[in-house]
């Protein structure tokens, strides 16, 4: 006890004398589970072997065993991931620690360990004292292939930290490494630098006591680079870059400030966050025209588990010399569209220039049944009531911690829930064998071998029959991308994506239905439930999960020309892609010679349905704003396909019937049966392939040369934009020859400045001239004959967002929209300085506005994110 008092006294004195001192932990455990010798990791930290006195003496015989990874990707460090301790039964570690809050970090690498254990199929629970940290947890379902995982928790402990691993039925548990680190007293429970936890949506501040545990969900260095554990301020935390969480393109600006010295204080000592966090930040930008910032927000989206409360810690520090007094920069803070702080003035609250500060907020993310992993949205928007010097906002860091519920539970659901964990393929138990057990084992093995041989024969025959129908490989994924090991829930490592048959597709990618379930969902494929018919077959409206979930069920017809190849392509593509503007594949069925794909249900059908309305009396036309929002959403989906995955994915069949609309008219790209993986190396510029697509939308350069690039999708999307504007078919015979081709007709009218005469008549009183001009510019650039003259989808997204901003700005100013004055930048087919300027400016995402107290939040579409979340092929977060 005296030693503890002396340590605390020393820390307090050092904080007074030198506020820049990092924290020195009093408890440090780095356990390399399963290893027999101490080893140093890549950062120079020393990991020790398991001390027998830390292991429970109550464990049954053979409760655990150790093994080495049979295969380890080059990007995965050997310490602590080469060795593992594997548990057959409940197993408890007991660590003697000083009273207080502790970091607990668990290290996992799901791979095969020897011949005894395949961690990919492992399901287990983890408890610490009275807290449930993980329940029926699958490491493999939580991260991409060939990645490692670190789960970080913060738990209050009296004198012993009891860590228990419990395998789920018919499964084993495992762990590679255990880390326990102490922290400053009540560092995450007392609140921000002002010792307050602001309770968002409530009038009373939130208090945290020792009955609560945390899970670190995100820790982000906003505007800066990744900060590794040894770069932290003594607690070995890991800070990610924020680029993967930003909403919109070119969101904000990062100031270029060098030589900044942070002046830590008693309220914000150096251990709160390293200098790398406080010396970097993200601003809204637009310094020369700050009023532009009133039209958008700085927005981040973070996927979290529904049904939990979260502590969101925001870090701030004013490091720009021009912000040197109170009132220079004032902004509002929102979480999930709820106002959390109306007037945030970092200079005033922190006390001045280069003085760091941090605030804590408690945010509840309700389980509303719409999503298992909703986005926790963080918005910063300028506060304009007091006319600050700069309409701007600033943020340096974000930490998001999940709070345990009243039962002490922190465990969320696995990304793909399963009714029960799969049994281990090989789970031998060490112990004394008996000869009487040998004969039954031999009989079982022989019988299984015969059954397996018969099954393989059937599969081979089916596959040969399918390949006879189609010998073109639509997805070339033979190249094995490099791996990456990272921290926490945001793991962007990838592994081999070799094509698999549908029946062997991992269940964590999508759900496999039996034909009985499919027939039950569609009332045995009842004809009146058909909601669409295409080249693949019929699409049925159905219900799964006892009628709780509406789905779209696409069934391959025996006479379909597309056949099994497109079925496999779409299954292979969509099972690995997750984006809010791509239709979600829920599962598939390949029983009884049936080929069925199950998607999320899109209540508002296709974009074509709403452009070419059958019943114009009961089906109102889409407004110009809604058309822009739909186009932006579809463009973001294509943008993700082109730049957000490990390799470029080319859709090849973009058209209005393949853009679906959900209940909120959010656009989602669908039908990936013709999709191809683009160039897989820097030396490749295109893919040579047989021409496929839909007449009218087909890229003429692709048709002539059979050379496929992502610019082919850009062309098809440009045709969609023209349909949205003019609301007429691409080809018409009952019109004069000069009007027969939509693309030529629009180009001709654009050059003659008469586009206002050919747009959809329903838009005449709604569309604004400046918005239409920019929309036409980008649409016509998309449909240039030469692919090199077409813009990338990044530019298309930005231009459409800008068109939406121009429309809303003009509406606010009550511009006269009856007279449309088009000012084309030049003849179609040329690029002028005016067009270059259109795609070189910087702006943020623009959306509708809502008002809370006097603070205006510009509400963007949170579905555009990014994140987006965790999936196996993510490579460039900014492309989200």
UniProtKB/Swiss-Prot annotation:
Q: Does the keyword Membrane apply?
A: yes
InterPro entries on file? ANXUR1/2-like, Kinase-like_dom_sf, Malectin-like_Carb-bd_dom, Prot_kinase_dom, Protein_kinase_ATP_BS, Ser-Thr/Tyr_kinase_cat_dom, Ser/Thr_kinase_AS
Cellular compartment(s): Membrane
The chain's Extracellular topological domains, given as residue ranges, are 22-440
- How the protein sits in the membrane? Single-pass type I membrane protein
* Signal peptide from the UniProt entry: 1-21
- GO: which molecular function terms? ATP binding; protein serine/threonine kinase activity; transmembrane receptor protein tyrosine kinase activity
What is the main EC category here?
transferase
Provide the GO biological process annotations. response to metal ion
> By its UniProt entry, which Pfam families does this protein fall under?
Malectin_like, PK_Tyr_Ser-Thr
Superkingdom of this protein's organism: Eukaryota
Report whether Electron transport shows up as a keyword of the record: no
Q: Where does ATP bind?
A: 531-539, 554
Q: Which family does it belong to?
A: Belongs to the protein kinase superfamily. Ser/Thr protein kinase family.
Protein's UniProt name: Probable receptor-like protein kinase At5g38990
Q: Which organism is it from?
A: Arabidopsis thaliana (Mouse-ear cress)
